Amino acid sequence: MHILIVNNTSIPVQKYGGTERVIWWLGKQLVKMGHQVSYLVAPGSYCDFAGVHVLDHNIPFNQQIPAGVDVVHLNCKVNETPKIPYIITLHGNTNDQAPLDINTVFVSKNHASRYGSASFVHNGIDPADYGDPGLNQSRNYFHFLGDAAWRVKNLRGAIKIAQKAKISLRVIGGKRFNLNQGIRLTFDPRIRFDGMKGGAEKNALLKGSKGLIFPVLWNEPFGLSIVESIYFGC
């Protein structure tokens, strides 16, 4: 089967990007199962196991579907409904009051139930991207993992928890200076900002962590950072 995976960002992900990681791993496993995979994604994308096409929102979507595609897997909004079989994965929460497409699938049971659905598929991770979890390694801090500029991830709350518990916190995914939120005046030496990290750098930080501090302010659809942290035993 020829499967077209569609998203409006580029692949492969370099640092932060849960959806990008999920569709990359999904495509890789589908190829291993014997399927043909193509991506329709943002400019600058490349892939060594599947074809890559550039998504252009100014062109009718159906004109961008490569010849021979059997099913379309949408991970973002497009400008028209596919004329061939398709499925939509909703990765986040939406405030749009319009009814969701009947082909929408969610990423957890709770996520689906909040939209009146029972259709969900959990995200997975590829252990090959993470390596040895270092379960016997010494650990001396906790971590926050996520886009700190996104208020619902509640970095402020994570810092307060760490300070009240008098523990060290590594902030993976945020900087001390943020033009959108102003200067974070966090002078506590136990709070360290590591910025956006990916690959080996992020893995090394997770290996040294005792646990994830994750006081989100919304209904988390899935939480890839939770699964990544569990993989490393923290």
Give residue ranges: language-model regions:
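Active-site proximal beta-strand in glycosyltransferases
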Residues: 3, 70-74, 82-109
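A short, active-site helix/loop in glycosyltransferases that binds the activated sugar's phosphate group
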Residues: 93, 97-120, 125-130, 154
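Conserved donor-binding/catalytic core segment of Leloir-type glycosyltransferases
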Residues: 118-123, 128-172
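Nucleotide-sugar-dependent
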Residues: 14, 20, 149-153, 217-224
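N-terminal strand-loop element at the rim of the active site
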Residues: 7-17, 24-61
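Short alpha-helical segment that forms part of, or immediately flanks, the ligand-binding pocket
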Residues: 203, 227-231
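Acidic donor-binding loop of glycosyltransferase active sites
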Residues: 144, 207-221, 234
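Nucleotide-activated donor-binding/catalytic signature segment of Leloir-type glycosyltransferases, i.e.
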Residues: 181-200
